[in-house]
């Protein structure tokens, strides 16, 4: 591998790491929103929890949680891929 290609790879790895940091920030914000929605549902009286609006809030909280899990997994996979690239380049 020549210096020019190595520099390009390092630049792209840095860009990917920056994107991952942005995703982590977004993930934290989504987790905060999921917590807020779940707390909203949990603080409702049982009668309201069973209402259409209560069920909708619970569904939204669950959707946020599912999305958070998927995004977290994707971030972990991306970090692993970057580590593999760095190891290959530095051999």
Language-model features: where?
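Long, low-complexity or tandemly repetitive, helically biased scaffold regions used
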Residues: 2-91
């Amino acid at each position: 591998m020549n210096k020019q290609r190595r520099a390009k790879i390092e630049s792209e790895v840095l860009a990917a790491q920056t994107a991952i940091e942005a995703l982590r920030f977004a993930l934290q914000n989504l987790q905060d929103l999921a917590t807020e929605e779940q707390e909203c549902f949990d603080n409702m009286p049982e009668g309201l929890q069973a209402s259409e609006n209560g069920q909708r809030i619970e569904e939204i909280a669950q959707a946020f949680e599912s999305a958070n899990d998927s995004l977290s997994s994707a971030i972990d996979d991306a970090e692993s891929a970057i580590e593999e690239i760095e190891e290959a380049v530095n051999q």
